């Protein structure tokens, strides 16, 4: 028998550099999602937290961190790390637990705080790690790395600068309707280029 899974509510903290702990952002989003769904925290049976590596141990165990901040309730917890995909991994883990019959109500929470400037790899010397190599050997920050990938896509598949600009235009359009979006200004392909 197939069991349906649905997202009943959503919440979001406004994007930006607000100078507070990532837990505050996650708790606000979680409470907003619960209110949007009409579900009380005590009814949540499972919490999947999207991990962040830039916030010390609480970031590594984000599921437990968010559950504790919301008020321990006995809900099971999981922490999921997948860099920029940690949130989607947390959704996948929560879905799997619902489908397995481990819970009926799950809460997925993801939040992060980042330093200003470029993201340097996590400390330590790891000469077999491509992320470490690109940063330390050739100075390729994330911006450079993604620019190189974009150029490769242009060479392999014929993508154009206008194609990439169209993505920014589309994203800006969506931001206009979202009061929590970081960028809320309409743009055109010409503006971007």
Give the positions of each predicted feature.
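Conserved "HGTGT" condensation-loop signature of ketosynthase/thiolase-family condensing enzymes
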Residues: 1-76, 99-100, 110-193
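Thiamine diphosphate
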Residues: 90-98, 104-106
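Aromatic/His-enriched, Gly/Pro-containing loop or helix-boundary segments
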Residues: 67-93
